[in-house]
């Protein structure tokens, strides 16, 4: 492990869970810069957050889609907040609950003034879906910067990963004003985690 990677791990390992909130107005205000993680249900948001923070239990993981239904706030080294937003695109919740979660996500993305970057997670095996594109459109309409994290790349062949990235790059030409980069990642194999850490650290 390089000294740079070791320093990043030390930075991110100083973390704490500040709370879980089912209303945007409940989320504490503060002066720290903030980034958020968003994606379809069961895309691996909590696992990636745990890999970044070198903590197995900071963000609660579940094999059950739709488990994250609140805004979860984590503070890293008293320098930056990481937000885990509810997953979207899960059909087995009621229409009323889907609307409630959609409003929660939209209120956060519109009104959070210290939000510096949105990380949109996409399962590499599945690729981008219409619900992801809806989120991309909404983020850009509200003038937020975003990056894409392709998750679970350890479960895909290299050629398949490259095709998924090529497809994304072609699509993202339409979003070049707000798009930053694409990360390939695996929480199980620690692939791409240092690069994501560097990006988050650059926001502090």
Role assignments for model-derived ranges:
Residues 104-179:
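Conserved C-terminal guanine-recognition region of P-loop GTPase G domains, centered on the G4
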Residues 77-115:
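Conserved nucleotide-sensing/catalytic segment adjacent to the nucleotide-binding pocket
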Residues 1-92:
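Conserved G1/Walker A P-loop phosphate-binding module
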Residues 11-24, 155-204:
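Canonical P-loop GTPase G-domain recognition
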Residues 67, 80, 87-90, 125-127, ...:
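Conserved nucleotide-binding/hydrolysis micro-motifs of P-loop NTPases
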Residues 42-43, 49, 72, 78-79, ...:
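Structured catalytic cores of enzymes that bind and process phosphorylated ligands/cofactors
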Residues 57, 67-70, 81, 97-101, ...:
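Helical mechanochemical/support elements of P-loop NTPase systems and associated helical scaffolds
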């Amino acid at each position: 492990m390089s000294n740079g990677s070791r320093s990043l791990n030390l930075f991110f390992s100083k973390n704490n869970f500040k709370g879980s909130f089912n209303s945007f107005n409940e989320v504490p205000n503060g002066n720290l810069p903030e980034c958020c993680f968003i994606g379809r249900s069961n895309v691996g948001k909590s696992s990636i957050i745990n890999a970044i923070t070198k903590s197995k239990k900071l963000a609660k993981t579940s094999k059950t889609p739709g488990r994250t239904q609140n805004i979860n706030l984590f503070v890293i080294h008293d320098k930056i907040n990481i937000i885990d937003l509810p997953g979207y695109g899960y059909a087995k919740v009621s229409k009323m609950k889907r609307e409630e979660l959609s409003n929660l996500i939209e209120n956060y993305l519109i009104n959070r003034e210290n939000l510096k970057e949105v990380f949109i997670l996409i399962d590499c095996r599945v690729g981008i879906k219409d619900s992801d594109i809806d989120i991309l459109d909404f983020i850009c309409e509200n003038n937020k910067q975003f990056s894409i994290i392709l998750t679970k790349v350890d479960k895909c062949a290299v050629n398949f990963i490259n095709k998924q990235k090529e497809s994304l790059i072609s699509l993202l030409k339409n979003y070049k004003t707000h798009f930053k980069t694409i990360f390939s990642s695996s929480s199980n194999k620690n692939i791409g985690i240092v690069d994501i850490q560097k990006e988050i650290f650059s926001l502090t």
